[in-house]
Regions:
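Basic/polar N-terminal segments that are highly enriched at the extreme N-terminus
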Residues: 1-4, 284-286
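Acidic/glycine-rich phosphate/pyrophosphate-binding loops and surrounding catalytic core
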Residues: 2-211, 215, 227-232, 238-241, ...
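Short, charged, intrinsically disordered terminal tails
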Residues: 265-286
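Short secondary-structure boundary segments
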Residues: 220, 243, 264-265
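Short, structured secondary-structure boundary patches
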Residues: 219, 237-241, 281-286
Length: 286
């Protein structure tokens, strides 16, 4: 996705979130701020973690009012600690109050994913293994969640169903065999398209190698079977480990020598990073 298309997609998603939250009127804000009043509000970290999504946070306020501005003390990928001043938002008080929740939802979610990814990726230091995400993302949030994974030190697997062939158990059942599934994928997809296949045992791995798969994913295979599979593949395909990956076993999996470890938990299980907008201050002296 090129940068222009990406911006349009992101703007549409943020506007959709704002429409969902505001609908017709922010009745609370309209009650206490019936007219425009210049103000500032402070962005504060309430927990330790990695910041991600600052541009999305700022864009939320800009879409409500182009005159809004945000000054950050940190950049995406920086570590923050509880109590740190992260930035200041300046603009119409009505915009600051009405946009607060949506802006924080994006920033907290993305920062939580970046923090979780950072902690998992740290366990892979010194290995060749790359930590990658999956398509197990929140509907409507994929572009943000995958960006957060990269900010946290991970890499993106395929973005969607159009970007690569991934043959899973049901695809293999539909085709009739591992070999047939790979052959059919090669016949249909462009020669530039990567073909990956999910294997559950050594027999499937052997068949996938012989059929010419580009990447072979070990799905919930035992440690010993994965070691045997890597030896069997002998560099003829890239290898990926998936299933039940956590901070306690990720290093042992990497030490097998797999090229990639994929984890859906990066996006579906990461807790948010607690951040807050505090100390709104009116600047008109009224």
């Amino acid at each position: 996705m090129n940068p222009i298309t990406m911006k349009l997609v992101v703007d549409d998603l943020i506007l959709q979130a704002l429409r969902e939250d505001i609908t017709f009127e922010d009745v609370s804000t309209a009650s206490v701020c019936p007219t425009a009043r210049p103000a500032t509000v402070e962005l504060i970290a309430k927990a330790d973690g990695i910041i991600a999504g600052l541009d999305v946070f700022a864009r939320t306020f800009e879409l409500l009012d182009p005159q809004s501005s945000v000054l950050f003390d940190v950049a995406d990928g920086d570590e923050v600690h509880a109590g740190d001043h992260v930035g200041q938002v300046r603009g119409d008080a009505r915009v600051l109050l009405s946009g607060e929740r949506v802006a924080l939802n994006y920033l907290q979610r993305m920062s939580g994913i970046a923090t979780y990814t950072h902690n998992m990726a740290a366990a892979l230091e010194g290995t060749k293994t790359v930590l990658v995400d999956t398509r197990k993302t929140t509907p409507g949030m994929r572009v943000f969640e995958k960006a957060a994974v990269e900010i946290g030190g991970g890499s993106n697997h395929r973005y969607n169903l159009s970007t690569a062939v991934m043959l899973k158990d049901n695809h293999i059942d539909a085709a009739g065999s591992v070999t047939r599934a790979i052959e059919m994928a090669r016949a249909h997809a462009s020669f530039t398209t990567t073909v990956e296949i999910e294997c559950e045992n050594l027999g499937m791995v052997r068949e996938a190698v012989e059929a010419g798969a580009d990447i072979i994913m070990f799905d919930n295979m035992t440690h010993d079977d994965m070691a045997a599979a890597i030896e069997l593949i002998a560099g003829r395909a890239k290898t990926e480990c998936s299933g039940n990956v956590d901070a306690n076993n990720i290093r042992a999996l990497a030490d097998l020598g797999v090229d990639y470890i994929s984890s859906g938990a990066l996006t579906h299980s990461a807790p948010i990073l607690d951040l807050s907008l505090k100390h709104l201050r009116l600047l008109d002296g009224k």
